[in-house]
Regions:
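Residue-identity detector for threonine
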Residues: 9, 17, 39, 62, ...
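Extracytoplasmic thiol/disulfide redox context detector
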Residues: 1-52, 122-131, 160
Length: 160
């Protein structure tokens, strides 16, 4: 998100089943967008870091959607966090959200069976853990430095 040539880079590692990540997307990300991305000071990169099997499946669904639907899917899943993560059958709830976004049941089922995507996601998580010491979500890295996930810490690092 933002100008690829922006002078600063904010990287977010997140899990779709992380309540703190949902709060970050609701409260902090809009401030980052308004004050840092829209002003050209920074670009924002989201990286999947699913913390459990349900999160892996949810992240897989966002990746199976057309690229232009990725951010809307993530936003929808976070906005409806409690309604799908706490269901007795969260996969059915996830399938319903995917359907609303235009993903049919066949594509949804095929997506969840995609072993290559699943293994690729696990591999990336391992890389992020080794390279950036990511071990929880949300993890925020600004210009290569891990910072707290509040807006003031992020802005302070950008303005350094």
């Amino acid at each position: 998100m933002g100008d690829p040539e922006a002078p600063n880079t904010i990287v977010e590692y997140f899990s779709l089943t992380c309540g703190q990540c949902a709060k970050f997307h609701a409260n902090v990300l809009p401030k980052i967008k308004k004050n840092l991305i829209d002003t050209g000071k920074a670009k924002f990169i989201s990286r999947d870091f699913p913390l459990n099997n349900l999160a892996i499946l949810a992240h897989m669904v966002t990746r199976c959607a057309p690229r232009k639907h990725y951010r809307p899917y993530v936003n929808t899943l976070f906005k409806n966090f409690s309604s799908w993560t706490r269901k007795s059958d969260p996969i059915a709830a996830l399938k319903q959200i995917a359907k609303l976004g235009g993903m049919g049941p066949e594509k949804f089922d095929a997506c969840l069976q995609n072993e290559r995507l699943y293994q690729g996601m696990r591999k990336k998580m391992s890389e992020y853990t080794k390279k950036f010491a990511v071990d929880s979500t949300p993890t925020i890295i600004v210009n290569g430095v891990k910072v707290d996930g509040d807006f003031s810490s992020i802005e302070k690092m950008i303005n350094k």
